[in-house]
Amino acid sequence: MSSGLPSIAATAQPSANGFSFNNGFPPFGIYYSQLPPVNSNGSTPNSSNRFKVKRHRQRVDAGEPRNTYQGASTSVSSNSSSSSSTSNTNSTPSSSSTSSKKSTEGMTETETMTASIEQEKVIQNEESEAGKDGMEEHDDGMNDFEIIDDTNDEVEESEERESPESNSSSASKRKSFQPQKIGEELGIEFGDETEQINVTVGGTEEAEETTDEAEGRELSALQAQLQNGHIAEQQRRFYAAFLDQQRKQVAAAQILHNGKINIERLVSSVKGDLVTNFMKDLEKVIRDWAADEVLKQEAAAPPQIPQPPPQFHPIFPANPLFHMAPPHHPVAGGGIFPPNFNAFNAFNALRRNLQDVDTSSEMKKKRTKVEIKKEDAMSSRASPLSASASPPLSRFFPAPTMVGHYGGMNFGDREDSPTNSDELSECGYEGGGSSSMLTPMHLRKAKLMFFYTRYPNSNLLKSYFPDIRFNKNNTAQLVKWFSNFREFYYNQMEKFARQALAEGITDRNDIFVSKDSELFKVLNTHYNRNNHIKAPDRLVFVVQETLREFHDAIKQGKDIEPSWKKTIYKVINRLEDQIPDFFKEPNFLERLET
């Protein structure tokens, strides 16, 4: 079995002490004439004049893992042999003269290097073929191999520090470059932690530098492309973030603006509600407080006996003969003066007549027909001098005390028309002829006529009251009634118009009136208490327009003027309607009683 050594090295006979060769090697004298002596550990004696061996990591381009020769005993590290051979070939000798013993050792080392060169060529061919296959895995495994190399370097350095067989430094041990196979054949034991040395010189170093420069240029171009793309991406992200921030700010400003509008509307509505509720509560509290105060004062005050009204006016002097008995006793029988005549008691008769009227109003009796028989009429006229037939003389001849005084009551006051109230409307209507006195039934009729006309003239009123003999007094009284009707009507309109403004109604078109409205019910109760007739539909429109006119006037601040209602009066005056003809019927007042 061939040992793999050159023929010259194979024919050499070992000496007794190991590897001394007595014969020289003339063929290699040309190349190694100035070969420096080698120490026992493979290093030159002058370490300052030698080249420092540069340690490189195994290139991944070769496609082989690091230290492959350690797995097989027959393989020899190509990089180690090549590096050792090239290093020794190009090394500069430190001295021109060496001893023969040292020259013999140099020749032995030269043979070893020659065998390593041949073995290197074979391995390089194999590595070149394997490198073609490994180029495809270069990009994916670059980072992994670098990590593995760093780890192996650390392990190797730690092993070198911990190995007891190491007699020299790590750098000198790397220079031993003795292959494992040659050491085994020659009987030389190397440590288990033999390291692979990569020394690149000459053309190999230049090729590697060229490859590194190409890779550096490619890497620089790739980094530039990646950097430019990264800048563009950063710019795109910056602009996107800026636009997103602007959109958020605009949306936040819009939300704030809408919230401000909503808050202002809420504040205005809350303010209006608070003012309205406060006024209502204040009125209620004041009204309750006033009622309580009145009740307390009445409870604390002593009971008072009602005093009868004075029989004479306060400025009239008292009559000393008022309570005295008549100077003569009543005489039975007739005469010029009836027996019940009392000249000093005329006011008692007047008071009795007034009490009779009050009693009749309290009884609220219905109107009944009075039937007078002929016999009764004849009997009443049979004895004209009888006491029952002749009326009291005080009715025809009033006493001096019955004459009206300053500030007192006149006799004509009893015959005037009643007031605006129809409280005496249940007394009945005494029809059957014309009269100059206005009754409560006439007042009720006038209120119903107000549904159609608010400003009637005197001629129109006379045509709808045919049973009244009009004179100056009752005509003025009838006109006064309608004036009072209008006053109540406009007061209600002003009240509800201010209430609508307090509720926040600012547009007149938002005001609507129907027969179910509170305002219309108040008016109908006042003018048509017993619902004798159905309220006309036209009245709803008139009430609505009146309320709107008051609303606009108060809203514009015209109510501060003294005569601000005159404009409204002119508008309402144009809304007059025709009064129905059934108001002229003679029995219309009788229907009002039912």
Swiss-Prot record:
Keywords: Developmental protein, DNA-binding, Homeobox, Nucleus, Transcription, Transcription regulation. Residues 1-20, 30-180, 358-389 are annotated as: Disordered. Transmembrane segments: none annotated. It comes from Caenorhabditis elegans. Residues 435-593 are annotated as: Homeo-Prospero. InterPro entries: Homeo_prospero_dom, Homeo_prospero_dom_sf, Homeodomain-like_sf, Prospero_homeodomain. The keyword Nucleus applies. Transcription factor involved in developmental processes. Controls the transcription of genes required for excretory canal formation. Belongs to the Prospero homeodomain family. This is Homeobox protein prospero homolog 1.
